[in-house]
């Protein structure tokens, strides 16, 4: 470890790094896991007990299920109780700023060169920024930093206080995030195996087998003090395996990040672990050739091999390649002789400074420019605690205000938010834990295909009594519900449908009438179920279009319509029409889309929206007139759009007969 004096440029550079960390970490909440964690935390706070069943489920609330994040959930519930959702953003920012401050400090002492420590921390920001979400896994980098000196240095492991530090880390980690706390045991297990290899294979008298065994035993004991660890890991494993098999992006190999595009941050996440693996192996070959068996450190080999396997295994783990990289950087810095140290350190410092600046720029492009679309949009969005188009804010608010009851077949990303606001009046079919039985998985997967969703809604209602559905529009491909289903509420692309034979159907329709009457709909007591849905959708459209993000989108679209460039005008008209289509203002959307098609009759996407809008607004002949052009232009449509048009054509044909 090297202690360096603090200098003003260093303070300024670290301040920039931590300011960016604070900015990214305080972004509007977008983790789909957050709200079921929060709801479980509220249950723990109110009952004083950790839930042992999947009590939020509409299907199997008595099914055994233990979540291993109970302490994080309880703490976040306390934060929200006293400071609201804004408090979660602030707390997240403080935790991650502290994490990166500790990371820089640890690297500064390990490497002995400020600029190397700064560049290393900047790389960690790029690799870990995707985990800047309000969920327990955001803490893993902090625990990684706390264990970094322990894994890098034999001297640290030999200190008298180290077992106590390991015990504290193990207890805290296992109760905050039991699943990832296993990494501590795996790491210390690798150290113990390495020490045994040093004694048995390399015949080294200084092999600290007993010390390594003590640290591992302390870590295991600390983890087992969690009341949820073993059951939590068992239940998590039964839930995560089907997720992996179904292609959950978080659990795909790191290289699959390139599916999202060849942007700098994606390239680093996708190829960074492989680049570090190549650099580490090359460096080890060089060192062993130069020094022979004396250079072999089996402890380090096992640690780095394990971390590199995990880093390659899943996108979410890419940052774990930082451990082998830390060994490489530290060894390079330590190898320089006193005579060449000044020259080499100056050169390395200059390269590291340029690399750090580039990495910070990459992180800013990814988190702000790409994440929000522009600085102007970032400012607009940042004022809200919830990221736009992430949670069913409008429909959940309606369901709570109206007092609607019943089980919900829902978009899997919405389950947590719906549970937070509506449980126990409403249970959900699924949330992001995916605690599903084998019989539920096909319904869940196929209900997220808009073309198969109506059949899955019918199957879920028949099998599990889920009388409500909550999905992104269009719930039904042609915008008209199947027989038996009635629209309760729509706001933008959020839709709630009620089955007419549901256990709470009559009560929910009565609640909708009262809700509409309270908002000035004079004849709410006499409207038909379909007319009730239309009235509710009209209110929802006004509220949704008044939201900041929609106002910004419409303003940008109308600005494009004033352009001298025809293609830009067409794009602006299509964007405005699509936004009005989302809002459910089909007649108005049709008029806007028709104006764009006058300029470019070959705009297949606009014509697809126009056909759906005409059909939904009752103009079947107008919709039918679009089918020949759409058939000719179908190669320009997405598979889902082609499927919608095929179903629309069948509906039109059935109507003609």
Language-model-detected regions and their locations in the chain:
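Transmembrane-helix signature of polytopic, membrane-embedded enzymes
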Residues: 15, 103-126, 141
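Membrane-interface alpha helices of multi-pass inner-membrane proteins
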Residues: 21, 124-128, 162-178, 187, ...
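Juxtamembrane membrane-water interface segments that cap and precede transmembrane helices
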Residues: 66-78, 234-266
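Transmembrane-helix motifs of polytopic, lipid-linked glycan transferases
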Residues: 90-110
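Specific aromatic-rich, kink-prone transmembrane helix
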Residues: 102, 124-127, 139-157, 188-196, ...
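Membrane-interface transmembrane helices that cradle and orient dolichyl/undecaprenyl
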Residues: 147-163, 195, 273-293
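Short hydrophobic alpha-helices at membrane interfaces in multi-pass membrane enzymes
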Residues: 153-171, 208-214, 295-304
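C-terminal luminal/periplasmic domains and tails of membrane-associated envelope-modifying transferases
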Residues: 366-429, 434-657
